[in-house]
Design a protein with these regions (language model features):
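Short beta-strand/loop element within the Bergerat-fold HATPase_c
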Residues: 150-162
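Short helix-loop "hinge" at the ATP-lid/N-box region of the Bergerat-fold HATPase_c
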Residues: 142-144
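Conserved micro-motifs of the catalytic ATP-binding
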Residues: 79-84, 124-127
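Short alpha-helical segment of the dimerization/phosphotransfer core of two-component systems
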Residues: 59-64
Length: 279
């Protein structure tokens, strides 16, 4: 009887997929109608409050889409019985793809992105490509959410005796602590989020046997520190590592997908302005 009760209350993968399709289809419909209304207003005119109402609906739909995507991915990870198959990848190349969007970020958010390899030209690590991309994207997204216009985010990579250390440091609102002003600014920066991004980052690290810590930046802001085991697999005679090869089409698809994910993240960012105006 207990087994039958459990089976009745469970949801199958097919049922979950149908729920996802309905949700995303509805969100896409909201987005298309918001776009139509904006074009209609441009032709016929509309007062500022009406335009703002439509913009708010569009922003809420984007945030819901982001939260739903994160929740679904997190549930998939938590329900998987085994960890993903890891392959050697060049982390430097992945970070270059992320940093390649720095011009777009500067133009839209007024935040500078700096990439610092510390003299490294390649960084071979064992990883799942999808998990590594999600991790880098969400660490950058968190840093951008915390940053103000005119701020900067530094993505740095260093090798130690025991591991690679990837850090993402911002000069933004910092971690919420006992200081009331800092806590309020942190809340404003991440207002409207379900705070699934950090959970997703930790889960990506767990699946790849990496580790993640958050700590205060030296002067102001937050530093995310990812410790990655050194590659211990087979190497060629010249010391290089044979990476998993992808076709040119696959590489271009990855770059486009990464950019598309970052564009969506940026559309959920709070409006920039003078922090004194918020309090």
């Amino acid at each position: 009887m207990e087994q039958q009760k459990t089976e009745t209350r469970s949801i199958t993968a097919e049922q979950r997929k149908r729920v996802e399709e309905v949700c995303f289809r509805s969100l896409a419909l909201i987005g298309r109608n918001c776009e139509y209304l904006e074009q209609h207003f441009d032709r016929t005119g509309a007062d500022e409050s009406t335009r703002q109402a439509v913009a708010d609906i569009d922003t809420a739909a984007i945030q819901l889409d982001r939260t739903l995507t994160e929740a679904i991915t997190l549930l998939e990870f938590l329900h998987e019985d085994t960890k993903p198959q890891l392959y050697p990848i060049d982390l430097c190349e992945l970070l270059q793809q992320v940093a390649a969007q720095s011009d777009m970020i500067r133009a839209q958010l007024g935040v500078d992105i700096r990439l610092d390899y510390g003299g490294c030209t390649a960084c071979c690590v064992m990883a799942d490509r999808r998990d590594a991309e999600l991790l880098c994207l969400h660490l950058l997204s968190n840093a951008l959410h915390a940053s103000r216009e005119g701020g900067s985010v530094c993505i740095a990579l260093r090798r130690t005796e025991s591991d690679w250390q990837l850090t993402v440091t911002d000069d933004g609102c910092g971690l919420p602590g006992e200081d009331v002003q800092a806590a309020l600014e942190n809340r404003r920066s991440f207002l409207g989020g379900a705070q699934l991004g950090l959970l997703l980052c930790r889960e990506c690290c767990r699946r790849m046997d990496w580790s993640l810590q958050l700590e205060p930046a030296p002067e102001k802001g937050t530093k995310a520190v990812v410790n990655i085991p050194l590659y211990t697999g087979e190497s060629r005679s010249d010391g290089t590592v044979e990476l998993r090869t992808d076709s040119e089409t696959e590489r271009e698809q990855r770059k486009y997908h990464l950019r598309a994910m970052l564009v969506r993240e940026m559309r959920t960012m709070p409006e920039r302005g003078d922090p004194e105006d918020e309090f």
